Amino acid sequence: MKHYMRVCAEINLDAVAYNFKSMKDNLTPGTKMVAVVKTDGYGHGAVPIAQMVEAYDYIWGYAVATIEEALLLRKAGIKKPILILGFVFPDAYEEVVKYDIRPAVFKLSMARQLSEEAVRQGKTVHVHIKVDTGMSRIGFKDNAESADIVKEISHLPNLDTEGLFTHFARADETDKTPAEVQLSRYLAFSRLLEDRGVNITLHHCSNSAGIFDLKQANLD
């Protein structure tokens, strides 16, 4: 009888650390990095990677896809900010506020519910506004009407509009024009918010390709 083993991958954290250093060396001075560890760190182990880079001063925090992934990191002792890039269902808002998770906000109704939950718990919920500049997933449209909505969101009690972000759809292509157009739209929307007195602490949009090839997109 033959015995078979399941396929597995052995991850060398020294190699992962080297990759982080390579990314850092391409960052614009003063720009921090978000460690994206969704889907279990793309199969490399979200928890051990997050624990390894927690002490890196250039790591602002982490990004995941779901509330479950965020809670896994929190319960493993991760203290830095955790941003959920995808949709968060209302039944998870209590945990979002309780465990200080950053949700991506792209609807006024969502922001209102998060604000109400934060008031109920006596805490502040820090949100990152998602603007769609060309990826065509989730996000506010980059227009004046959306800017007015974000202004309303910024005035909700116990809610901090901490960040504004978008996602490049084609930054890894040789032709950088589509990504440059997205960056231009993002910056224009950011100015619309500034004109309305909306205070955003963190502006971010670069993915890996953006870090390497679009220095002008290395923001906060």
Label each PLM-derived region with a short phrase.
Residues 4-5, 39-56, 116-118, 123-126, ...:
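Active-site loop/helix belt of alpha/beta enzymes
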